[in-house]
A protein has these predicted regions:
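Short, P/G- and charge-enriched loop/turn segments at secondary-structure junctions
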Residues: 185-190, 244
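C-terminal accessory region of radical SAM enzymes
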Residues: 143-182, 208, 213-259, 265
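Short, small/polar residue-rich loop motifs at catalytic or cofactor-binding pockets
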Residues: 194-198
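Radical SAM enzyme core and accessory elements
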Residues: 163, 204-212, 217-221, 225, ...
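Residues that scaffold the ATP/ADP-binding catalytic core of kinase and kinase-like folds
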Residues: 41, 64, 68, 212, ...
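Radical SAM/AdoMet-radical enzyme domain recognition
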Residues: 1-144
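Short, surface-exposed amphipathic charged segments that create phosphate/polyanion-binding patches used
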Residues: 138-139, 181-186
Length: 342
């Protein structure tokens, strides 16, 4: 599968010819869009060219979504985009980031996923990259995962029962009690910690190749397809072979001593790099949060250095390990057994 992302892919002149070329080479084609410029007419050429699926972000209720997207009216336009695409015959899906602004709105997002006939819902944690790098208070703290994951497991079960694929992203994990449920479609459910350079690659607009489209450009480009064959970049580039060729010495901090180190390999490379400047130590791990919690501890990330302002930029954070103090937990899952209705 080839997924066209942006910016907005449909703003590129002749982008439907790219879709046709993808389909002519025997690959399926999906599009991820912000959903802000999609009219009733615009999905029709995409459907005719062969776009099979369109994914639109829904990041909470109207106020939260518009705040996160920094665009008044973005929520209404995103929902309209889902409706327009379905009318054109394109299957639709929703993707959502999870952070402290929408942590308690996941049930409401799930209702919209069902109401708009979506075939899938991808979930990932907000990472401090791009605009999010400038708003550290929006991020979840690692200890929030202890209470978040049971909610995700309940929603996964409820939507799966209604034939909606709930797809936790590569930075939602790892090795906790719900991992097999989340990754049941994989041959090895615990092999989903990072797909970069293993089952995924990213092609930037200028032809640069990365193991994952989310990774920063600096340090993670393995070559350019204008200069080298894609297969040569894939096989020979150190940047793309990083997760394929596991070396225990690359792991550090908690991940370096973890029981699951060899299988997990430090979790999502993008998340760790965006937080700490290098991969190999990822505090956003369910097993890790549970391990600390059982010992009366928790981890907190604190921004040390602001982002530079460049594309794919990120700041730097420190990890603080501290005792769990009495504090109001964020609102627990209020509906542990409530079924979502269409």
């Amino acid at each position: 599968e080839v997924t066209l992302i942006g910016g907005e892919a449909y703003l590129f002149p002749g982008w439907t010819e790219i879709v046709r070329a993808i389909r002519a080479h025997g690959m399926s084609c999906a599009v991820v869009s912000g959903g802000q410029g999609i009219t009733e007419e615009s999905p029709r050429p995409a459907a005719e060219a062969g776009v099979e699926s369109l994914s639109i972000p829904i990041d909470g209720d109207a106020a939260t979504h518009d705040r996160l997207r920094a665009k008044p009216g973005a929520y209404a336009r995103a929902l309209a985009a889902l409706r327009h695409a379905r009318l054109a015959g394109i299957a639709v899906a929703v993707n959502s980031q999870i952070n402290r602004l929408n942590l308690h709105q996941l049930d409401a997002i799930a209702e919209q996923v069902l109401a708009h006939g979506c075939h899938g819902w991808q979930l990932q944690l907000t990472v401090p990259a791009g605009r999010a790098a400038d708003e550290p208070d929006v991020l979840l703290q690692p200890y929030d995962l202890v209470e978040l994951f049971p909610v995700l497991a309940r929603l996964h079960a409820q939507l799966s029962a209604q034939h909606v694929k709930v797809l936790p992203g590569n930075n939602v994990g790892y090795f906790g009690p719900f991992e097999r449920q989340f990754r049941q479609s994989l041959r090895c459910p615990n092999d989903a910690s990072c797909s970069a350079g293993r089952s995924v690659l990213g092609i930037e607009a200028n032809g640069d190749i990365k193991g994952c489209p989310s990774l920063p450009t600096r340090g993670w480009v393995g070559g350019n397809v204008r200069d080298h064959r894609l297969v040569d970049i894939w096989e020979r580039s150190e940047a793309l072979r990083y997760t394929r060729e596991h070396r225990p010495e690359r792991l550090w901090g908690f991940c370096g001593t973890c029981y699951y180190a060899d299988a997990c390999r430090g979790g999502c490379t993008w998340t760790a790099t965006s937080l700490l400047g290098r991969p190999g130590n990822n505090p956003y791990c369910h097993h890790r949060a549970l391990d600390h919690h059982a010992r009366g501890l928790r981890e907190r990330v604190v921004q040390r250095e602001a982002a530079s302002g460049e594309p794919f930029d990120h700041g730097l954070f420190d990890i603080v390990v501290e005792a769990i103090e009495p504090r109001p937990a964020f609102v627990p899952d209020p509906h542990p057994s409530t079924e979502i209705s269409t």
